[in-house]
């Protein structure tokens, strides 16, 4: 199962926000909503082999992880408000060390980037960090669903986060020389994996 980690530095960590103001009072929650849709949606269906891990680092309780499991998620439509509603419901739950289900296929717990990286590393997953200075993704012939892709939000990734990612031996890859929005990167990544798995990669 392919995994995406999106680091959200300003995203509000309580459910006290309006679905009518996702970019503002919710701390650019609109970015996370677009990332969820890019990760999970096909033309007329949902992907069933994707997990999305939203790392929320905004106020007032930084350090929450919301996981979307595409195999079991329900009540998700292809619009920002729908995804925002599921995030809001998750944030209304008490987040502790262990996951709590808020709605089908959506879970929340407390944690940080190190928490996720350690878990993936211990599970033998391949960590891939997206950055325009990395190796061209099309040079990777073994891109499969085993990979975990790590992306920043509109603020990118801090030096401390990047150092932690490198300490966990993540491979840095690029989708091209020009920085792209995280949700656009996800669509391109999914396409590359789809092509590799179908044997049509060039």
Curated annotation (Swiss-Prot):
What GO molecular-function term can you cite, just one?
S-adenosylmethionine-dependent methyltransferase activity
Keywords (alphabetical) are: Cytoplasm, Methyltransferase, S-adenosyl-L-methionine, Transferase, tRNA processing
Q: Which residues bind S-adenosyl-L-methionine?
A: 130, 152, 185
Which Gene Ontology biological process is one annotated for this entry? tRNA methylation
Q: Provide the protein's localization.
A: Cytoplasm
Q: What is its EC number?
A: 2.1.1.257
Pfam families, A to Z: Methyltrn_RNA_2
Asked if the Swiss-Prot or TrEMBL record annotates the protein with the keyword Cytoplasm, the reply is yes
Residue ranges spanning the membrane: these are none
Q: What start-end ranges are recorded for coiled-coil regions in this protein?
A: none
**Which family is this sequence assigned to?**
Belongs to the methyltransferase superfamily. TrmY family.
Subunit and partners = Homodimer.
- HAMAP family named among the record's database cross-references: tRNA_methyltr_TrmY
Per its record, how is this protein called by name? tRNA (pseudouridine(54)-N(1))-methyltransferase
Which organism is this entry from?
A: Methanococcoides burtonii (strain DSM 6242 / NBRC 107633 / OCM 468 / ACE-M)
Q: What is the lineage of its organism?
A: Archaea, Methanobacteriati, Methanobacteriota, Stenosarchaea group, Methanomicrobia
């Amino acid at each position: 199962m392919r995994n995406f980690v999106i680091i959200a530095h300003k995203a509000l960590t309580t459910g006290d926000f309006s679905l009518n103001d996702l970019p503002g009072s919710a701390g650019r929650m609109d970015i996370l909503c677009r990332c969820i849709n890019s990760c999970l949606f096909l033309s007329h269906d949902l992907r069933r082999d994707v997990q999305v891990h939203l790392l929320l680092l905004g106020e007032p309780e930084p350090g929450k992880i919301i996981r979307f499991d595409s195999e079991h998620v329900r009540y998700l439509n292809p619009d920002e408000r729908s995804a925002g509603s599921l995030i809001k419901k998750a944030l209304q739950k008490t987040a502790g060390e262990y996951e709590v289900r808020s709605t089908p296929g959506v879970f929340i717990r407390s944690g940080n980037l190190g928490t996720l990286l350690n878990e993936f590393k211990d599970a033998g997953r391949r960590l891939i960090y997206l950055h325009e200075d990395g190796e061209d993704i099309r040079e990777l012939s073994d891109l499969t669903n085993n990979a975990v892709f790590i992306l920043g939000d509109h603020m990118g990734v801090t030096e401390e986060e990047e150092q932690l990612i490198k300490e966990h031996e993540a491979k840095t890859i690029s989708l091209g020389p020009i920085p792209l929005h995280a949700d656009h990167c996800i669509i391109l990544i999914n396409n590359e994996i789809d092509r590799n798995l179908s044997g049509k990669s060039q």
